[in-house]
Structures are given as structure tokens and as C-alpha cells.
Amino acid sequence: MSKMKRWQKVVAVFLVIVLFLGIVALYLLCPRTTAKEVDNWLGEESFDIQSIKTIDKTKDDFTILAITDIQFDNPFYSKKDVKTAIKNMIDKTNPDLIVTGGDNFAGIFNHFHVKAFTKMMDEFGVPWAPIFGNHEYDFHSDLYYLSKQMMKSENIIFDVGPTNIDGVGNYLINIMDGDSIFYSLVLMDSNAEVFRYDGRGNRLYSYYDGIRPSQIEWYEDNINGLAKSEGRTVDTILFSHTALPQFNDAYYAIKNNTPLDGVSVKYNYGNMVEELGGCRYEYGMYEKMAELGSTKYHFFGHDHSNNTSLNYNGIDMTYIQNTGHNKDDQIGGTLIKIDSDKNVSHEIIMGNS
């Protein structure tokens, strides 16, 4: 064989390898999508108590283990340690429900991560209810595809929610005591990042988004719908990935000993290690919560090192203890207990044995 032919063969083999690797990379990197099933919310007339997800209260107390920011399959953090910590918390608390507070998985391979995360959650054998954080949006991931994969779980309680309002996965779970609603959980998508540009298309800055006006209207319709159905205001707990701006106001009022006009604030527990990274933009969610008088507790994550709980004008605003990004002895969650008289208590629970 001449040198020229040998060289041509080497080049051909090299090109075949490059083509093969390119196909593999395309398969791995290409985001997965699915058809969106249209479900339009048309105001209070769309409220249907029968369509709301439910879970039965089977003992005096109803306990929720809230975990957050697992960012499953992130190569920089140990899945084994996180899984062990969650299992330890389940063994300690015997929860009726696990709520995952967003950033459940992260990165360019979210379409694979969601499957591994869902498999892990199913292995615990406990009903679980997820919300989305900002990292589920990574690399333009299709949240409807991610939702479809999670809904293959045997133990999940989840609803994609209306498709004509902001966010994906805005839904309620009614905790049932016989035929009546004992308590209700409101789970909402606080969306991802917002980017601002100048007139020439240059990015000026970005900030984390929050619960938007269309979602607030949906929230109001559901709170009013629950009240009409039950003949009373139904007590609710809100879960979202990021805090409301009022948390920041309360924190600095307490830290700097500067009272807020017409507002009472109180420190409950925990530490603020990093600045509030959640929503700084005022969409009006707190005002609507205060007006309707149903939601007295809000739990959120996002800022990995914080576990502070404050009270702002009668509403507890509480960071869920981080589950995926801390050192082993700081991996944990937040245990929420609703007793038979509907009194709510919450505390940090650690994942070490």
C-alpha cells in the first residue's frame, strides 16, 4: 500500500470518528421537547375543586419535609451524600409529603438529569411534590418535557397547571380530612432570570424573576374558589423557589434596627450568610396574600447558605435548609408540621444520621 493510500485511510477513519462523536454530542446536547397540551385559565369560572390534586390526612398531624436546590447530577456535588441525607431525614421525620423547592436538577443535560432525579425520589417511597427553580430553565430546557418525565413517577403529586399564565407547574394540593379540606398547599413557579438590554442589544444587567401578575390572578381565583367551595377561608401554605421582596425589607429592618412604617417584623431563627438572590421586583404577591388572608406561611430556597425565618406582618417567610450544596454536615431540609388544630410549626432538620 502506497503512503498516499495509507494516509487517505487514516484521514477516512479520523473523519468517521469525528462524525460519530458529532452525532453522539448532538444526541446528548440537543434539548428534548414535547407538545404542550393547552390548558387555559379563564378566571374564577375555571375553578374546579375536583381538578385539584389531593392527599389524605391519615393521622393527627400532617408533616411535610421540604428540601431544596438538590441540583441533581451536578458533577461537583455528591449524589450519594444527598440521597443518604434525604433518607436520613425521612427516617427521622416520617413525612406525609416531601416538597422539593426547585433547582431539583441543573445544567445542559437536564433532559437526562430529570430522569435520574425522578428515579431517586421514587426510591424513597414517599409522596412528593416538586416546583421548578431557575436551573430547570438552563440551556432553554423545555419544562413541559421535564414535567412529562417527572409525571412517570409512581409517587409524584404534580400538575403542569394553566398554560396561558406565566411559569410551569402552578398548582394546588388539598390535604383532605374526610370530605373537607384540612389545609391547602399552593406551589408556584417563580420563573428564572430577566435580562435588560440597551438600545443596541447589549446586555445591561439581569435579575432573578418572581411570581408574576398572571400567576397572582390565578392565585387569587383559587383562594376565592376554595373559600366558596368550603364556605370559609381555607388556610394555605405557599412554596416557591425564590423569596418575595418583603423578606429583604424585613431582614434589613431587623439587622439595622430600623422599624418599617406600619409593618411588624420578627426574627424566628436561622442565619443569613449571603445576600438575598431572589426576586427584587415588586409584582404584588405579598399584597394579595395579605388581602386574602389565607396564606400565612411561605417557604423558598435558591440562596444556598441561608436558612433564616422571619415574620413580616403575620406571614412567616422561611428559607428551606439547603439539601444539595452544603458541606455534608450542613445538608438538610425544613420540617413543617400542621397539628390537628391547624397550628403550623417549622424547624430545620439535618441530614446526618
PLM regions with names:
Residues 1-19:
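N-terminal Sec-pathway targeting helices
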Residues 28-36, 40, 47-53, 172-178, ...:
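Binuclear metal-dependent phosphoesterase catalytic core
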Residues 29-116:
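N-terminal active-site segment of His-dependent metallophosphoesterases
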Residues 33-53, 116-231, 334-337:
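Extended active-site neighborhood of metal-dependent phosphoesterases/phosphodiesterases
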Residues 61-74, 182-192, 239, 316-322:
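Active-site-proximal beta-strand elements of phosphoester/diester hydrolases
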Residues 69, 86, 98, 103, ...:
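Divalent metal-coordination and catalytic microenvironments
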Residues 73-75, 106-111, 132-142, 193-196, ...:
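Active-site environment of divalent metal-dependent phosphoester hydrolases
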Residues 93-96, 184-186, 202-304:
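His/acidic metal-ligating clusters that form di-metal
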